[in-house]
């Protein structure tokens, strides 16, 4: 299996009233996160976000207006237990944040090898449930981003 590229997309799926989709990891039950995944060779970051969204949830981003690039990135240390997936010596990943608004909480099709279950929670309840600081931080910033997008319209 080829090594993963240490560049990823995080996709916050949310409703207009700021309920957020969280997924429970299959490899670490009790670890909750938004849609996330590594870039593949030749992909743009938007393509990575769109592909991961479809793979992990079955959601077609184009059917909901496409993902929105927050033009925000975070660098974080890769957990030692996951470093074997990356080229030797790789210790950090750069994550780029995207969002997708859906009209209401929708039923998702989980990839069972990746996730056990999902929840739709108000953003203030979803943020502390995430094991990743960058995921928590992105959810905490969701109200400002959504309000800014509404002002621009």
For the regions a language model picked out, list residue spans one by one.
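Conserved N-terminal beta-strand and adjoining loop/helix that marks the start
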Residues: 1-20, 41
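Short connector loops at helix/strand junctions that flank enzyme active sites
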Residues: 6, 29, 34, 65, ...
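Short, well-ordered beta-strand micro-motif
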Residues: 13, 24, 99-101
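General beta-strand recognition
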Residues: 19-22, 33
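The catalytic Nudix box helix
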Residues: 34-71
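Active-site segment of metal-dependent pyrophosphate-handling enzymes
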Residues: 59-106
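NUDIX/MutT-family hydrolases
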Residues: 96-139
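Short, basic, low-complexity termini and linkers enriched in Ser/Thr/Gly/Pro
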Residues: 148-153
């Amino acid at each position: 299996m080829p090594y993963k590229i240490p560049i990823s997309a995080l996709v916050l799926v949310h409703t207009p009233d700021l309920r957020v989709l969280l997924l429970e990891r299959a490899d670490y039950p009790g670890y909750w996160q938004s849609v996330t995944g590594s870039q593949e060779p030749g992909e743009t970051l938007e393509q990575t976000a769109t592909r991961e969204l479809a793979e992990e949830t079955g959601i077609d981003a184009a059917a909901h207006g496409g993902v929105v690039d927050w033009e925000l990135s975070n660098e974080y240390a890769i957990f030692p237990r996951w470093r074997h997936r990356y080229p030797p010596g790789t210790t950090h990943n750069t994550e780029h944040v995207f969002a997708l608004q859906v009209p209401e909480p929708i039923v998702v099709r989980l990839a069972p090898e990746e996730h056990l279950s999902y929840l739709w929670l108000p953003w203030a309840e979803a943020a502390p449930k995430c094991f990743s600081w960058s995921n928590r931080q992105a959810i905490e910033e969701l109200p400002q981003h959504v309000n800014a997008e509404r002002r621009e319209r």
